[in-house]
Curated annotation (Swiss-Prot):
Annotated family: Belongs to the UPF0337 (CsbD) family.
TM region positions: none
PANTHER family to which the protein is assigned, alphabetical: UPF0337 PROTEIN YJBJ
Protein name, per record: UPF0337 protein bsl1473
Species whose genome carries this gene: Bradyrhizobium diazoefficiens (strain JCM 10833 / BCRC 13528 / IAM 13628 / NBRC 14792 / USDA 110)
Gene3D superfamilies membership: YjbJ (1.10.1470.10)
Length: 66
C-alpha cells in the first residue's frame, strides 16, 4: 500500500487508524486528513514515542492494509 492511496482515500482508512491508535481523537483524524507527517506528529504527541518508532509503527500499519 502506498501513501498516496491512503491520502486520497483517508475517509476509508481513518477507521483503521482509529482502531490501531485509540488515543487519536476524532479531531486528530480530521486534522491529519491523510497526511503521513501529520499522523506521525499526532502519534508522537499522544503516545510519547520517538519519531523513528512512530515511523516504524506507521510502516507496520501500512503493511496490514489491503
Amino acid at each position: 500500500m502506498d501513501w498516496n492511496r491512503i491520502e486520497g482515500n483517508w475517509k476509508q482508512f481513518k477507521g483503521s487508524a482509529k482502531e490501531k491508535w485509540a488515543k487519536l481523537t476524532d479531531d486528530d483524524l480530521k486534522l491529519i486528513e491523510g497526511r503521513r507527517e501529520q499522523l506521525e506528529g499526532r502519534l508522537q504527541e499522544r503516545y510519547g514515542k520517538a519519531k523513528d518508532q512512530v515511523r516504524q509503527d506507521v510502516d507496520d500499519w501500512l503493511k496490514t492494509l489491503h
